[in-house]
Each structure stands twice: as C-alpha cells, then as structure tokens.
Amino acid sequence: MEKIVLLFAIVSLVRSDQICIGYHANNSTKQVDTIMEKNVTVTHAQDILEKTHNGKLCSLNGVKPLILRDCSVAGWLLGNPMCDEFLNVPEWSYIVEKDNPVNGLCYPGDFNDYEELKHLLSCTKHFEKIRIIPRDSWPNHEASLGVSSACPYNGRSSFFRNVVWLIKKNNAYPTIKRSYSNTNKEDLLILWGIHHPNDAAEQTKLYQNPTTYVSVGTSTLNQRSIPKIATRPELNGQSGRMEFFWTILKPSDTINFESNGNFIAPEYAYKIVKKGDSAIMKSGLEYGNCNTKCQTPIGAINSSMPLHNIHPLTIGECPKYVKSDRLVLATGLRNTPQRKRKKRGLFGAIAGFIEGGWQGMVDGWYGYHHSNEQGSGYAADKESTQRAIDGITNKVNSIIDKMNTQFEAVGKEFNNLERRIENLNKKMEDGFLDVWTYNAELLVLMENERTLDFHDANVKSLYDKVRLQLKDNARELGNGCFEFYHKCDNECMESIRNGTYNYPQYSEEARLNREEISGVKLESMGIYQILSIYSTVASSLALAIMIAGLSFWMCSNGSLQCRICI
C-alpha cells in the first residue's frame, strides 16, 4: 500500500503545473568577441566594419573628379601639349593622378615648391583660366620660336601651352619690364620659369646676353633668379633645364617681371573661383560613372558603418580607417538553443541555471513557458524585451555616432629634401592609426561583454520577479522552472506574468499539497530504513553461518587445528 501511495505522489509531481523563465534562441551563426571569450554565438549582431568597395572612381556628391590620366599636375597646369584635353576643365571634386605619369615636364627640369602647390589644390575645386599677358604682346622678342623637340605635338616641336619661352629677336634681347594687376575678386595662380642653358654658346645663341637674370616681385614676393649654366646629361634629348615657379596674386595686388634673358613668361593664369575640400589622389582607375560620399584610391565606399579597413587614404564623408579584420557589436543574446550547455555567465542566468534558449518564442527576447491542464505555450515578456531593445539600440547608436565622424585622410607629398620629415610623418600617422585601431577593438570587446551580461541580468531579474511572487507556493527545479504546489490555470499563469499573482488565494492549497508530499516522503523513508536494517542483519547472519561451516569442515579433515586452552 505504501508503494502505491509513493508511486501516486511521484506521478502527481511529474504532472504538476509548471512555469519556466527563458530567453529567445534562433538559427543565427553570428559570432562576436568579448573580453573573456572569443567567437561567442549570438542571436543578433551588428557589423560596424566596412570591408567592401566598388573598385571604381566615382563622382563625389554628384561632382565628377578630374582624372588626369597620363598627365601630371605640372603637365596640366603648364599645358603639356599631350595634355590638351585639360586646357579647360570644369569643377572637380578631387584630382586623380597616376603614380608616375608620363606627361609631366616634357622639357626636363624642376617645379619649385611643387608639393606646396599640390597642397593648395587640396583646397581648390575649380580654376578659371584667363589670359594675363598675350603672346603677341612681345614685339621686341620672339614669342613663337621658343619650342623644343622634347615637347612634340603632331610630330613637330612644341612647348607648354600656358607659358611663353621668349627668345632674342634681331640679335637683341631688350630688358623686359612687365606688370600685371589683379583686378579680379578672386586669387590668381601665376606660373613662370627660367631656362638654364647647357653652355655659354647656347646662352648667347638664344638670349644674346651672356649674363642674365629673372626678377619677380609682388607685395609678398621678392625673387631674383640667375641661370645656372652647366654641362648636364641629356634628358628627352635636352642638356638644358627649366625651373618653374608659382605664386598666388591677391586681389588688387600687382606682379612685376623684369628680365634680360632666359625668361619663360606667363600667358595664362588660373583664377581660383571655388575653394573647398578636395584632394590629389594617386590611382590608376578610370571613372566608373557612379556616385559616392567616400572615395579611396582603390574604389568607392557606400556605407553607413563607422569604420572601414579598405585603404588608409580617403576623400569625402568617410568612415575611419582601422587595421582590424573584424569588428562586430553584439545586440542580441547568447544563442544557446536547448540541449546545448554553455559556460556560466557573470550573473549565471542564460549560461547557468537555465538549460537553453527557446526557438519557439519569437516575439521577444525574454519570456515564459507554462504547462498545465489547459495546455502549454510561450509568452514573451514584452516590457523587459522593449527596455532591452531600447537600451542596446541607444548604446549602439551612441557608439556609432562617436566613431562616425566625417573623416578624410589624404596623402601628403614631400620633396627630396624633406625625406626625414616624410618618414617622421609616416611614423606618427602609423602610431595614431595603431592607437585608434586598439581603442576601437577594445571598445567593441568591452561593449560586447557588457551587452551579454546585460541580457543575463535581465533574465535573472525576470526569474527573481516570479520567485518573489510564488514564494513557497511552488518549488524551484533548478533549471529556470517552478513547479506549483497548487493548480494554476491560464488565468493564474497570466497573473504571474503581469505581476498580479494572488499568493494568499493559493497558499492554503499549496500548503496542504506540500505537507502531503512531505508526509509521503517521510513514510517512505521509514519503510526504506526498516528494509535496510533487516537486509544488513540478514546478510551478517548468513556470512557468520558460512564462516562457521567452513571452520567445522576444515577441522574435521585436519586442515585446521583447533585448540581450546583453559
């Protein structure tokens, strides 16, 4: 009879009403890293590192780039005959120059402060070319004979289009004194040059005067250049060299030229009609008939992510460049479907006492599963889920806003005398980049740890909310579930979920069932104790009889000698 009562009690326990606290799980394979763990699978995650580009040069915010193709900036500005397509160019968003363009200074020489001029172009978006000293305004000098085979055009000798190489006329080179006043509202970019002959014979052949100079002055410039006559190896078939200069002439300022030979005079100047953020980008790509907000030398980036690892040099509204291969923010929970056990988390909620996530609960992150005589089902706790979603969304947006500063990094150029500065600049930029990469990676690791612990704490809080309501009307099963000592229908289950559970209403029924179950356990325990004692005594008696019989047999056949001493 006792066994029947015990069996009935066990069956009753199995069939008791239950409510469990759990969390959402899905088929996601997304993984994140935290301070403590690597490759943690989560239900939801957000990638914040852009890794793709389109491999094209695009318009920047609707404005096309100026792609110089085989021409250099110097070849474009001076007017290399092979760069005639760039004699007049529209507004540009940025300038694209190849690493080693073939059409630069066709007549060999140097461009003074060339890197500074390129820096000026990084703040300029449109030039308007204007004539300041017409070619036919040199009656005492030859303005059309200054050509060279080094600058061919259609198989004939030619020269830079925007400057005039002045030669002697009728064996005379009268001293030049010319001025130009900037009456425009915009700054003017003016270029001129000086010719350095190969020997004295070439000097007199071209300019008649053996000793010459070129003097240029403005309100901010005072320059006097003297030709350097020297024997040099040939480049492009020329032993002579040309040196070009530039200056910015402010409105209402005047530039004065004076020379008695070797002067390469300006014919055209560039009016800076629009300033703005631009850049000179080194790239061999062609225009891809596309539009972007961020351009790199290897392709355009169209992304709202705050970071990228595509190329350190960018122009436009760009994410920050980092050296990382992966930066993923956790937004969801640890993805641990049932039948999978994970390590215990900080609060022991998701990865601790709860066995696994529920793929059947799809309308929330945290919630309940109940079972009673009316059936079973899942119900999400939408209030805690919404609070968590809002909190994590705000945090992710805050992180992205902090990182997503409009950022551009354009390469800087240095001349041969500034290599140490260039090396120092590169080391500093690499150092800053390493620090920024480390900070970004550390921030992601820390925030992922906090997010997962935040979810653990929310599940634990939901569990405690139920535990505090039920008190001793149910018992904890240790797996996130509670087993009732009373009947709990769907209305009762709903009251637990919304926090209105009436403890006194069910306490008497729960007490009686609890005492009945405890009594059954005590009675069954007494039966087991009696059986245990009986079994022990019987076993000991049987063992003693066996030992006595063995001893008697051994004594009777002489195997064992028995002596009784008094």
Swiss-Prot record:
Membrane topology note: Single-pass type I membrane protein
Family matches, as InterPro entries: Capsid_hemagglutn (IPR008980), Hemagglutn_HA1_a/b_dom_sf (IPR013828), Hemagglutn_influenz_A (IPR000149), Hemagglutn_influenz_A/B (IPR001364)
UniProt GO MF annotations: host cell surface receptor binding
Topological domain spans for side Extracellular: 17-529
Glycosylation sites noted in the Swiss-Prot or TrEMBL record: N26, N27, N39, N302, N498
Stored Pfam families: Hemagglutinin
Lipidation (S-palmitoyl cysteine): C555, C562, C565
Keyword terms of this UniProt record: Clathrin- and caveolin-independent endocytosis of virus by host, Clathrin-mediated endocytosis of virus by host, Disulfide bond, Fusion of virus membrane with host endosomal membrane, Fusion of virus membrane with host membrane, Glycoprotein, Hemagglutinin, Host cell membrane, Host membrane, Host-virus interaction, Lipoprotein, Membrane, Palmitate, Signal, Transmembrane, Transmembrane helix, Viral attachment to host cell, Viral envelope protein, Viral penetration into host cytoplasm, Virion, Virus endocytosis by host, Virus entry into host cell
Localization annotation: Virion membrane; Host apical cell membrane
Record carries keyword Glycoprotein: yes
Domain of life: Viruses
Residue spans, topological domain Cytoplasmic: 551-566
Segment forming the signal sequence: 1-16
Alphabetized Gene3D superfamilies for the sequence: 3.90.20.10, 3.90.209.20
One GO BP: viral budding from plasma membrane
Site residues by UniProt (Cleavage): R344, G345
Coiled-coil stretches: none
Family: Belongs to the influenza viruses hemagglutinin family.
Note: Major glycoprotein, comprises over 80% of the envelope proteins present in virus particle. The extent of infection into host organism is determined by HA. Influenza viruses bud from the apical surface of polarized epithelial cells (e.g. bronchial epithelial cells) into lumen of lungs and are therefore usually pneumotropic. The reason is that HA is cleaved by tryptase clara which is restricted to lungs. However, HAs of H5 and H7 pantropic avian viruses subtypes can be cleaved by furin and subtilisin-type enzymes, allowing the virus to grow in other organs than lungs.
The protein's role, per its UniProt record: Binds to sialic acid-containing receptors on the cell surface, bringing about the attachment of the virus particle to the cell. This attachment induces virion internalization of about two third of the virus particles through clathrin-dependent endocytosis and about one third through a clathrin- and caveolin-independent pathway. Plays a major role in the determination of host range restriction and virulence. Class I viral fusion protein. Binds to sialic acid-containing receptors on the cell surface, bringing about the attachment of the virus particle to the cell. This attachment induces virion internalization either through clathrin-dependent endocytosis or through clathrin- and caveolin-independent pathway. Plays a major role in the determination of host range restriction and virulence. Class I viral fusion protein. Responsible for penetration of the virus into the cell cytoplasm by mediating the fusion of the membrane of the endocytosed virus particle with the endosomal membrane.
Subunit structure: Homotrimer of disulfide-linked HA1-HA2.
Stated name of the protein: Hemagglutinin
